[in-house]
Amino acid sequence: MKAIFIFLFLVLLFSCQSSEEKQLEKVLTLSGNNRSALEKVLEHYKENEADSLKLRAAKFLIMNMPGHQSYTGKDIEEYYVEAEKIIFSDRKIDEQVNELNNLLLEFPSDDFEFKEDYSVIKASYLIQSIDAAFDDWQQGRWARGITFEDFCEYMLPYKCVEFQAFDDWRNVLKPIANDTLCDFSYNDIWNKTPYHAAEAINIKLRDTVIVDLKKPLKWHALYKVPFWCNMPSNSCETRTNTALAIMRSKGFAVSYDFVLQWPTKAHAHSWLSILIDHDRRMVCEGGHDPFLATLRP
């Protein structure tokens, strides 16, 4: 009887382990010619036993890559070039919107080539992103109390929005609004919770992510350095994605949330959900004040 119990236990243990390994192998197979890049990431973290948690994080990202895509090809690159000329010109903001809308006639979004992330992502980018996320979690001030599982969901992702370009977004966005946190190290209460820091940054972002336009930007593919804080868009989706990237670059555990339609009106809406400890979240709109007061720590 004891032997049967041990046998069943080993079978169960093996099946649980193989399920994860099967999913990992499935993605590695789907990655085709890019398999060596993904395997390089895994091997990198296998070299040092101290990186065992980073290895788990790498597996988590790779196993969840199916369904996540990125633009590739010359059309999107040409679109970026033309968009940069418009956005960083001396034109008034409404003129920029008109020109960006007209640019979509020359570069229709349906014509942009895209591929699954697992087939194009580079090992160096993924390793850099994982290391940066771990530094923010373990060495930063605003997410020390969250679990590894929450870390994987709220901080680890290598991009913040679908079709975001693979670039150095964390380091580029990290300095934004840092002046608002200069005095926090002298206040024990403010320095021990992400609530007040996130609130201060969110207020500071008002001039960064909120734009007054006469005519809306119809659509864009500008989630890329150097466009992040320069997009002439007043949509809550763009505002929320930008604020999300900025908050995450600073080491806040944050996610994107939305409703497709309100029960009383025909509109969608989106907002940020910031994890302030292992079981409490605060909700805010990027650049808007105040936060929900009932969620104060």
Regions found by a protein language model. Give the residues of each.
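N-terminal accessory/pre-domain segments preceding catalytic cores
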Residues: C16-D207, S249, H278-R281, P297
